[in-house]
């Protein structure tokens, strides 16, 4: 079926031959610059004979490579953080199956980073370069390296497509903890490994890639960070011909200065894409994150109000802001009679895109800048919403509603802005086609699980005794005992109670059991 899909996708290509069968039995008759092992290595034991099926398979793949060729392996990480956080093992759908060592399974294996490094080295590929696709190699939206793993927000929330994923803890928080310990590369969800028989020589070093392939064709772009000599550059390129004009227009946008002390980072258009030097300073989000840790709420407000007053200094009242161009981008949902608007307007003005530069600020990622009036409150609402999503601790200091109120944004505005955002995201820019298959993570309360389990192991009962006035709560003893060797044993001590005329024993637990009075003294 996969071969059929591949064929129908690429039937017009003249340089592609599709062969179906066991690759170990094929003789391709030549050597290649690249051999791609994508989602295959983990199954090597099921179609390769011998005591070392994985090494045997990789050596076979090496026989198809030129001496200067490269082997590309894409595979899940056995110790991926998603598995600890509650995702089932990808190949068996069993929670923690890989972490537990695939007990009783003889068809599939994945590997930790160390295991994969050693396996590939023993198979004849001593030169290796690791990349980390995120959320995983099957549907990547970003690709990280060791140089960008701790600096480019690896670990953001992402959609899931299985209804068997439980929510044991925040995967994002787990990854952040691993970053602080400098071991995040051991807990990434997937590996993309480039390996060679000889040293891997490149003219430039790729540090990071972001893919926007889920958008409409005219907005599909690829952004990558590249190190050349001693400088790091960002490049944004169209993923298809339809997006070429979109990318080309960014050079003009890069020359704009949205407000006093704020300017877009200049870029130049070359070789079909835009190029600009990567900034290394702190972002406004970094600054606010530090202020959150110090619980300096007042300084957070002053920082955001400074942005608002400077970037939107030229805002003016616009009763006719919902123009035809506006409705094309944000939809027909009616807004208020008027808003204070700015033009041109960058609706993606989030704190992570604003870098400190001395006393001033430089703005990156300004691709969603429009030349018609847009409410300043709408842009500010998007900035605030993004902050609270990316810095959860902020909500404990100052609620998002209160923050909105600081900028005159009421709940009715939020409903309008959300409708505009939904239209922009899903209708204008275009959303990922996989969105319709998204599933919710299943909430799990481990404390409740422990409590329920303990209750099954506990037995509650109450003994009433009558001293002449009948049975009553005042004359009762309640006790709880633990299951011991397959039975509950309950003892009531009544030696200090005189003139007992009768007793009654009540079960308080919903337990079916056989009752036996062992001693009555």
Where are these regions (language model features)?
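A short glycine-rich, Lys/Arg-flanked "PGG" loop and its adjoining helix->strand segment in the class I
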Residues: 50-70
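Conserved class I S-adenosyl-L-methionine
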Residues: 70-95
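Catalytic activation segment of kinase domains across protein kinase-like and atypical kinase folds
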Residues: 91, 95-104, 328-396
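Short alpha-helix
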Residues: 105-130
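Rossmann-like AdoMet/SAM-dependent catalytic core
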Residues: 129-224
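ATP-binding glycine-rich loop module of kinase domains
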Residues: 208-259, 286-288
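Conserved structural core of kinase catalytic domains
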Residues: 264-331
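C-lobe/activation-segment region of protein kinase-like
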Residues: 358-447
